[in-house]
Design a protein with these regions (language model features):
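Terminal alpha-helical segments
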Residues: 1-135
């Protein structure tokens, strides 16, 4: 049995980013399987975990998604650490995920799900580069 270690903030960021990659892979598999609502969900969470990985470096953490996204937009998008259009794309990801999870009458399309996965890939690529530069 190894002694308990809390790790570093870099360890937390790495762990969160691993979740990101797992969620993105799941989103792609679900898209291919025609499970568009589930693909939307995983695409959103892949981005959310990527954002969490960025914030883990500070370190800050929030209990609510809206607070996490608001902080990220204020401190990383509005300051142009990340491109401004990414904030809008993440906002759309959140809206589509919410519809997919909670709107009984929302019908997810292949096109929307493919767009969600594409945006997730874009965000994750930007976060990967950011984490590499700020490691």
């Amino acid at each position: 049995m190894q002694p308990y270690s809390e790790g570093t903030f870099d360890d937390v960021a790495k762990y969160k980013f691993e979740q990101t990659e797992d969620d993105l892979e799941a989103a792609k598999l679900l898209l291919e399987a025609g499970k568009y609502k589930a693909a939307n969900n995983r695409a959103y969470y892949s981005c959310f975990h990527a954002i969490d990985a960025v914030l883990a470096k500070e370190p800050v953490a929030f209990k609510k998604h809206k607070d996490t996204l608001s902080y990220f937009n204020k401190n990383y998008v509005h300051t142009e650490i990340f491109p401004r259009d990414i904030g809008r794309k993440i906002s759309r990801l959140e809206i589509i995920r919410h519809k997919s999870d909670y709107d009984t009458f929302y019908i997810a399309s292949k096109e929307d799900a493919a767009e969600q996965v594409s945006v997730a890939e874009e965000v994750i690529d930007l976060v990967r580069k950011y984490l590499e530069l700020n490691n």
